[in-house]
A protein has these predicted regions:
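Membrane-interface loop-to-helix entry segments
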Residues: 27-49, 98-119, 171-180
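Membrane-interface interhelical connector segments
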Residues: 21, 82-101
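Juxtamembrane "helix-exit" motif on the non-cytosolic side of transmembrane helices
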Residues: 85-86, 125-127, 152-164
């Protein structure tokens, strides 16, 4: 799936003559724009379907989704680099998604998210029981929300201000402080709720 994703993006770059995303990309809606949005939705549906048939309970189904999404996203960039030697840098800007708004971020940002998703996915797949409180859930969900916000920050600002069009969105800067703090909180909460189960699993095996 990662190779197919990268192949489609390579074709789109060639078709639109895109060498520099910030300079060359055109978000003016056309038939291909809606096809691309449909392709993004279809990719998520495929990952969800794979997860639903892989896990024998909801915890594992979610785990397989996190795992497959993380691996897919990382190998998407690996295949892009193998095929067209892009990105030149892990800090190069990329359009991550168009649903529900255009997402922008340095390449390393979604890769970091994918690494965390793989870690959480493995914990769920191997049936570690999370002892999570309501407060932990709130902090966990808030950290995810803030990560998503950093990706859609510019799109949200244009949408709320009413000045300009989403088709004109170009990233101005990436809020590394909010992003990294959210990643750290996400990891800390995950460790906090999973370490007791990991320790218990270790004791039972000794």
């Amino acid at each position: 799936m990662a190779y197919l994703e990268s192949a489609v993006v390579i074709y789109l770059r060639a078709m639109y003559g895109i060498e520099n995303l910030l300079r060359d990309i055109n978000f003016q809606p056309d038939a291909y724009t809606f096809i691309e949005i449909g392709r993004e939705a279809a990719t998520i549906i495929m990952l969800v379907t794979l997860s639903l048939i892989s896990g024998n309970n909801w915890s594992k189904k979610i785990g397989y989704f996190f795992l497959s999404f993380g691996i897919w996203d990382i190998f998407y960039y690996i295949w892009l680099y193998v095929c067209i030697q892009w990105p030149k840098s892990l800090f190069e800007w990329d359009v991550l998604f168009l649903i529900p708004l255009p997402w922008w971020g340095p390449v390393i940002a979604p890769i970091l998210v994918s690494v965390v998703l793989i870690f959480i996915g493995l914990l769920l797949i191997y049936d570690f029981k999370f002892k999570i409180s309501s407060f932990d859930w709130i902090i966990f969900c808030l950290s995810i929300f803030m990560i998503l916000y950093t990706f859609m920050d510019d799109s949200i600002k244009i949408l709320l201000s009413g000045n300009g069009s989403l088709t004109e969105v170009r990233p101005t800067n990436f809020n590394w402080i909010i992003f990294l703090l959210s990643i750290i909180v996400w990891v800390v909460v995950t460790l906090k709720v999973s370490i007791p189960s990991i320790k218990q699993r270790g004791k039972s095996q000794n």
